[in-house]
Amino acid sequence: MQIKKVVLLLLYLVYPQTKCLSQTLYGTNNYVEYQVGNLPIVISVPHGGDLIPTSIPTRICNNPETVTDSYTIETAEQIKAALFLATGCYPHIIICNLKRTKLDCNRNLVDGACDNSQAMTAWNEYHNFITMAQNTANSQYNNKILFVDLHGHGHTIQRIELGYLLSSSDLELSEATLNTTTYINQSSIKNLVLNNRNNYTHTQLLRGPNSFGTLLTNQGFPAVPSQQIPYPGATSGYFSGGYTTANHTCFDPAVTTNGFQMELNYDGVRNSNSNRMLFADKFKNVVLEYLNTHTNVVLGSCTPLAIDENNESQFIFYPNPINDVLNLSCSKDMNTLKVINIIGQELFNKEVNSNKVQIDLSNFSSGTYFIHVTTGKTIKTVRFIKR
């Protein structure tokens, strides 16, 4: 199993431009997972898991925080779906499936795993997956990627908190002070300050018109820091970023990636499926605009190709665009086929158990569709056009 994981990852690194599929790599006992993507977006979710294996004792070392960030995994999945519908491709997502009572991946190894060997293994696999994802994305997109450590907060004020490793009091400082080398070097977007296409200053990137917080607020989700809410205020709660942000962004001199910790409020964002879907759709707008504005990465049409070059399971479909009949072939038997429209409705679902299939789509309206092909535990997704 471990050899297969490594082979799959290496194949993905060799062919980053030719895949647009949702493939998941799992750590030991499925305690952590890496949903492989091909967008310049890496999202980690450390506190949404619910697994409570009896072989891992409840954490009691060093006064641990054990509260679950409810519905953060579900929110990440909605973000993934929204980005896929917009671009045809996926963000990289790393998830800890263990409940926080068993493991905290946003702490150092000692405090997070409390010296339990299974928890320590999961902690290491989680952070290795983040590094793998960032290396893959940075290689494909010339180090112009964004990392988001996704959390949920329980503070009274219902707004999104963006943590750039600057304290609440730091954010109250003047523009001139925040733009000094001292504070730039403390920031998790340090490299973006040094190299962004519009030469925006540190303060402008934190709370200017094109900052992430301002763009979120403009989409109907108040965020701090932003042009509208430049700093949290001394009497309100605020999370500035934790272990993951400090070790997987350019705050660490050995890392090139820009990023931040994103703490989502509960009401209106995480508390229902409809709210999570709405937020994911707006987040999609924001992250694509943010990358385009600051890094010149344009992702309006990330078109998947028709050939999966993974030697273990070669998949081809043709023609594209199609008139009536879609032909599919695979080096292994395909188990199920699904056709989904651009708004996520499933229009076709069939068990096939064959390596060659023809689908009659003559009754489909003209437009863009996605086909999901299941082969064993792998799901391949590609986009096609019906004339």
Tell where the protein language model's regions lie, with residue ranges.
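Bacterial Sec-dependent N-terminal signal peptides
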Residues: 1-23
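Residues in and immediately flanking transmembrane alpha helices
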Residues: 17-18, 110, 333, 354
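N-terminal catalytic or cofactor-binding beta/alpha core of small enzyme domains
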Residues: 20-300
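Short, compositionally biased serine/threonine- and acidic-rich segments at solvent-exposed termini, linkers
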Residues: 302-304
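C-terminal outer-membrane/trafficking sorting elements
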Residues: 309-387
